[in-house]
Amino acid sequence: MLNRRFLRTKVFQALYALEQGAGGGAAKNEKELLLGVERTYDLYVHVLQLFGEMRRLAENRIEDRKAKRMPSKEDLAPSRRFVDNPFLVKLSESRQLLEESDRRKVGWMGEKDLLTQLYKRIEASNEYVAYMASPQTDTAADRAILVDLFTEHIAQYEGLHEHVEARSIHWLEDLDLACTMVKRTVETMGPEPGDIGLADLNTDMAEEREFVTTLYRNTVAGKEKDEQLIAERAKNWEAERIALSDMLLMRMAVTEARTFDQIPVKVTLNEYIEIAKAYSTPKSKNFINGILDKLFAEMKADGSIHKVGRGLLES
């Protein structure tokens, strides 16, 4: 479920810390790398729980209106469209989500003020008002309102960002990805009774752990050989003069191209150029592109790179 660029970035950060002597040796840095991936899933589950919390507050709001001393006709028979939204019901009653939340020890206990303010923000939104006032609804509208409320109001809520930062310094940098994962969950789940599709979470995590550990370990193991390969093709540059971030990204790219036979070479090249834009110097993307393009062509010619299946695409 985590996108590969995020995983590559996590590996890059772990390798950078290793080169800087931070966090201990290779094994300890690998452990922290895997914990980082796990923490992202913790955050995903935590944010996904907000739908259930919003439904609970909406139910409470309905009961409070009925309990007024002098309730109006609307108070006594309020619209239940939001609380009965099939997608919201499914999210709030998911056993998988409850079990995963318990296992990961994440929840919203003690956050009454934050949740109340968030619900008020949702209830006052144009999207919510229009949805509740619409003469009728359908499956597309029921899904769309949750996606819109999440994208425009929950994910953008400053109180959520402050809460996440207070809980973990690691969480804040992963919040955008976690929100993307939550949005994708809502967009892909069906309206029919049943669970929300977290069944593949463990499978996804196992595949992601294998990808990051293999990429990390093989990049560490091939350091001397790959640094020499890169330095030989960097005219007028000795290995020690190449920026550490550039060298690490190129070592990772060479390792990935050599190791993962179903990832196209073009995908690998483009991914590391994109990461360089965020983590290296302004000129790095052109430098890295030039070196890797030359190196990959040679590696294909001598058989160092061998692709199968999907890896043959555009390689």
Language-model-derived ranges and their functions:
Residues 1-315:
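Class I Rossmann-like S-adenosyl-L-methionine
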